[in-house]
Amino acid sequence: MRRVALSVLFQSSRVLHFTDLRDKQIALCNAAPGHTVQFHQHRRHSSAPVSSVGGQNTFSCLGASCAGLLHPSRVRFANRRRSGSTSKKAQVKSSVNQLAIPSAATRERRKPKLSNSCAPAVESQKVGVAPTTSRASGETRTSCAPPPASRMKPSFYVVAVGRQRGIYSTWDQCSEQVKGFSGAVYKSFRTLSEARAYLTAHPARSGLEKSDRGDGAASLSALSEPQVGLRRSRAAEAEASYVVEAPAQPTLRQRVEEEVPSGAAAVQRAESSVPQVVYVDGACSHNGTPKARAGYGGFYGSTSDSRNFSLPVPITEAQTNNRGEMRAVIHCIVQGFVDAGVPPAALGTSHCVEPDWELSELPQPLRRLVIYTDSRYVIDGLTRYALKWVANGFKLASKEPVLNQDLWRQLIRLRDAYNTRYAEQQHWAAATCSHASTRVPAASQSKRFHTHNTRNDETEGIELRHVKGHSNDYGNEMADVLAVAGARMHGTSE
């Protein structure tokens, strides 16, 4: 297809002169009725049925007002032959005089008619509705449908995952919640009902919702009762004032009880649920000295989450930073079991290698657990050395015993039990898609437990992810605050 440029050369009293027309399909014309639009075509060969006058194509304007787009069906071409001996000025004059310009009655008869089914085209253009022309009837029908959503300016911004969930009325307010936020999820909508539906369809996850401070920093002044959670600061109150609407989200247990009546459906619901994300850290003052006091903490992404914890390492055991890191991960795994229906008292016995509560039978499905930690000691121990330690009786290459064996045994057992139960749920869900009464025997998945699986990815029930410590990561900073507070609790208990 030939594409050539269009530009105005000059305008006489009744003739508009243009250069080449793009494929002779449309032209922009501001001529009054009866004016002539003249095109100067540099390329002489054309597939369009247009006559030439001195190498120039001409037609007359027929509409009441030619402002807008002209189609070949609305123009009238002059049947003129090229005259090679006359000058350009003579050619233009000759073409004007010999054009078949229609009469006023003809122009009135050919004038497009407006349909009464909607507002006039002029009014519709004011509200962003473009009129459509029917070639067959000559009528111009205006469409009352709004323009495509992609071209409409959004009025509501939904932050599903960010520093503060909710619906915002301006982009500036929305960007404050998602800019620089890892894993932010947000979307714009034209109507409030669509925004509400999107927010409801994306329930609050345990991912990070930074509602205290925007710079990722944290301080001990934000703590009230570390064992329960963090107190919302005034910055969070001010930030929350921007929210137009943020409906309360049900807990995992409420969603399972209300939305998933059967066991198989509950497993399917858990399979598609958003992973539970938690940041953990350990701290120790005077590490390596007799005055050492260790603590650990965990942050579930929101300062209002009651599962946030800040606890001291028991004074009856070694006070080290590594034991704090290990205890924090153990606490998170046990909390995952508690969320699935294990009695909350299990958190008090999480340090026991053989707890007095059952790991296998759970009334609710386990959620996939993603734990962020800055401890390579814990990650490498579980993913690289656990299988070897279990096989050789927790011995190092130097035949020396592995330190912190009590916590390693408990951590490996809990991790393997969690992964085994989670995998069984996934297989159960797959098996019960067609036969709800059929359940995969637990024995078919017992191999995972006995081999102490060391995989660490999104296919497992528990995934450990490394985060660089003291790198202004909000979740890590908040976990560090809780861990330090836990270490300082030794002074209040002694």
Swiss-Prot record:
Record bears the keyword Metal-binding: yes
Q: Which GO terms describe its biological process?
A: DNA replication, removal of RNA primer
- Top-rank taxon: Eukaryota
Q: Which cofactor does it need?
A: Mg(2+)
- Name the family: Belongs to the RNase H family.
- PANTHER family given for it? RIBONUCLEASE H1
Biased composition range(s): Polar residues: 84-100, 131-143
Which annotated residues bind Mg(2+) 1?
Answer: 281, 325, 374
Q: InterPro entries, per this entry?
A: Ribosomal_bL9/RNase_H1_N, RNase_H, RNase_H1_N, RNase_H1_N_sf, RNaseH-like_sf, RNaseH_domain, RNaseH_sf
Q: Name one Pfam family in it.
A: RNase_H
Q: Where in this chain does the record put each RNase H type-1 domain?
A: 272-488
Q: Where does Mg(2+) 2 bind?
A: 281, 480
Subunit architecture = Monomer.
User: Which species is this UniProt entry from?
Assistant: Crithidia fasciculata
GO terms for molecular function, please? metal ion binding; nucleic acid binding; RNA-DNA hybrid ribonuclease activity
Checking PROSITE patterns in the record gives: RNASE_H_1 (PS50879)
Entry's EC annotation: 3.1.26.4
Region entry Disordered: which residue ranges?
A: 79-148, 205-231
Enzymatic class: hydrolase
Its biological purpose: Endonuclease that specifically degrades the RNA of RNA-DNA hybrids.
Catalytic activity entry: Endonucleolytic cleavage to 5'-phosphomonoester
Explain how, and how many, cofactor molecules are bound. Binds 1 Mg(2+) ion per subunit. May bind a second metal ion at a regulatory site, or after substrate binding.
Q: What is this protein called?
A: Ribonuclease H
User: Does the keyword field hold Zinc?
Assistant: no
Q: Which UniProt keywords apply?
A: Endonuclease, Hydrolase, Magnesium, Metal-binding, Nuclease
